[in-house]
Amino acid sequence: MTRNWSMYQDRKLLTWRLALSSMERGVPALLLYVLESKGSSPGRQGFFMVVNGEGEMEGSIGGGIMEHKFTEMARERLRQGEDLLSVRRQVHDKEVAKDQSGMICSGEQTIVMLTLGDRDMTTVGRIVGSIESYHSGCLRLSSSGMEFLPEVPDRDFYFLPGEEWVYEEKTGYKDRMFIVGAGHCALALSRLMRTMDFYISIYDHREGLETLLRNEYVHKKVMIGDYAELGGLIGSGPLHHYVVVMTQGYRTDDQAMRVLLPMEFRYFGLLGSKAKVSKMMDGYRAEGIPEEWLRRVRGPAGLSIHSQTPEEIAVSIAAEIVQVKHGV
């Protein structure tokens, strides 16, 4: 049995919703979007925010003095009623002659400021609808304005600078997380990972499990007969699939692991003590399960920070996932 849940609002969705509601109410609004980032820039490619004429803001382009400067600039342009489509380069180095951001972190980023008008309402509405329905598409920003295309691009990001510049981004959820087991640690991990724009699915076989009922952070709850069913529910995904096995015991962990071991994931973690994980891996080796499969498993899952509570365990696993995601 599968249920979709949407009580928890995602950061990007909230930002686009502010853009849409501003236009629907006739409130002037500006979109700030990071088209390109280099080096140690705090605002990475794809970061964005919306500022409207009533003082509302959602999203971020990296924070700090640079973001403050741009939000103040946006408010001034809104007060003046400017129709703006302006690309600005920001260099985070006080030694450069121009385009200084006021920061000293040595990176740089390129930001577009775009006034949102009636012409953009349909486009933004489509973006909101696609995120709400968990579909992907292509956001295109260019010297001609903004549009949304239903075709999903091959690349997550693309930017062509110049006078007739073009920026394209795959919208929707790029990263998917599969949590196997729905206990206290899974609840804490779901809460944390939902803030990081992962599409989260959780699997358990225990009907009426209190921690599953309280878990309003996942997008999808899947009740299964037993963990042998996972083979038809979770597929390989070496680029964007992140899996953590954290069931209620050794037997159910083993059942899930046997189904998932042949698959490739960007991250594959197994929660448990060192002794339990070692015993499980030794057993698989004795059975002749390929060492290549076993090397892909991170067990015990999470960075070694002597975590004890579900919340601390969730932090350790989330940190390891972020580490893997960014290739550290």
What are these model-derived regions, one by one?
Residues 2-205, 209-220, 238-241, 255, ...:
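Segments forming oxygen-rich coordination pockets for charged ligands
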Residues 59, 63, 245-249, 269, ...:
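Glycine- and other small-residue-rich loops at beta-strand/loop junctions that grip anionic moieties
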Residues 183-184, 250-251, 275:
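Residue-level detector of alpha-helix initiation sites
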Residues 202, 221-222, 264-271, 290-297:
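Short hydrophobic/aromatic-enriched beta-strand-loop microsegments
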Residues 203, 242, 247-248, 258-283:
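ADP-ribose/adenylate-binding Rossmann-like module
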Residues 207-208, 228-229, 252:
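Short acidic loop-to-helix transition motifs that present clustered carboxylates
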Residues 227-238:
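Short amphipathic alpha-helix with an adjacent loop that forms part of the alpha/beta core around
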Residues 271-328:
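Adenosine-phosphate binding glycine-rich loop
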